[in-house]
Swiss-Prot record:
Keywords: Amino-acid biosynthesis, Aromatic amino acid biosynthesis, FAD, Flavoprotein, FMN, Lyase, NADP. The gene is aroC. Pathway: Metabolic intermediate biosynthesis; chorismate biosynthesis; chorismate from D-erythrose 4-phosphate and phosphoenolpyruvate: step 7/7. Its cofactor is FMNH2. NADP(+) binds at R43, R49. This is Chorismate synthase.
Amino acid sequence: MGPVLRWITAGESHGRALVAVLEGMVAGVEITSTDISEQLARRRLGYGRGARMSFERDAVSVLSGVRHGLTLGGPIAVEIGNTEWPKWETVMATDPVDPAQLADSARNAPLTRPRPGHADYAGMLKYGFDDARPVLERASARETAARVAAGTIARSFLRQALGVEVLSHVIAIGPSAPYEGPPPGPGDLPAIDASPVRAYDEAAEQAMIAEIEAAKKDGDTLGGVVEVVALGLPVGLGSFTSGDNRLDGQLAAAVMGIQAIKGVEIGDGFATARRRGSQAHDEMYPGPDGVVRSTNRAGGLEGGMTNGQPLRVRAAMKPISTVPRALATVDMATGDEAVAIHQRSDVCAVPAAGVVVEAMVALVLARATLQKFGGDSLAETRRNIDAYRRAVAEREAPAARGTA
């Protein structure tokens, strides 16, 4: 048997639709197409987004695995229609098309000048394509809409099974000074989503907007850093027993698998490497209900397991590789020097990246929860969680009393 919870996406950027399939979700989780649409609308947010976000509406259809707003326990398939499909149905048709029709289509012009930083070059060589179109269609960040759809189901499960909330905020765009204050809570999410750059701090927001404006004026693009916070996790998701069971490794792999993400850190991450051990770890003290800590430098993970503290995951997104002023490249058809192709793109997609990272973190946490607690229905999973929490409380009882 494979992993207890699996997901896969299908579809191209300008194809008929994107599809997400989530297998292994328990029965009884409340989820609707409206829930998914709301999360997809959050993905379209952000200052610096391109023209596509102004008309793409992400028409959601739940095809299977849900009945009357409740999951059934079988594979869940979600389709997200592409608004522009009528313009592309000849160029992106799955069945053969009359070559004369394709020859008359400007949209079918060969794309032979790969963009530095994109999948174009390696994809053309790896798969034997003379044209970058088949590469960029699947490599496009448009695919992340399907991940957000699957992640919406995962976050609903986490909320209903554990009371866990997953949220994100942008902490830096380009060279703007990163936000280093306390992380936001669930009540802060509406204000974050109302921010043009999904920033928690107003001063940081203004600096980020200024960076985007400057890049847009210069015909350039920007990356940045987002932080995802998960609140309410129990102790013990993940394991120390082998590398592939460590939750930090699973989270890093899932987040690094998002288009344009080039770095991941848990908690204070790289800053911890510059500290002495006495200043790097989160000391523990007896408290009213068990062990308490005054810091969370580890970001909620120790030894590959959740430790009951808020989970903090940061992801670094590189600048978008479709640069308006075009970078130097080689025309793969002629071998001549050239400038890279320019497809319609964003100046900055960091605010949207936070929503995508939320989705991937939620999927990994949902999988870890099901691996730990099992169950075929939400009610059964909850019973298992309740029993585990009682057992943990008993083990923590000496610390709760302040005794050895």
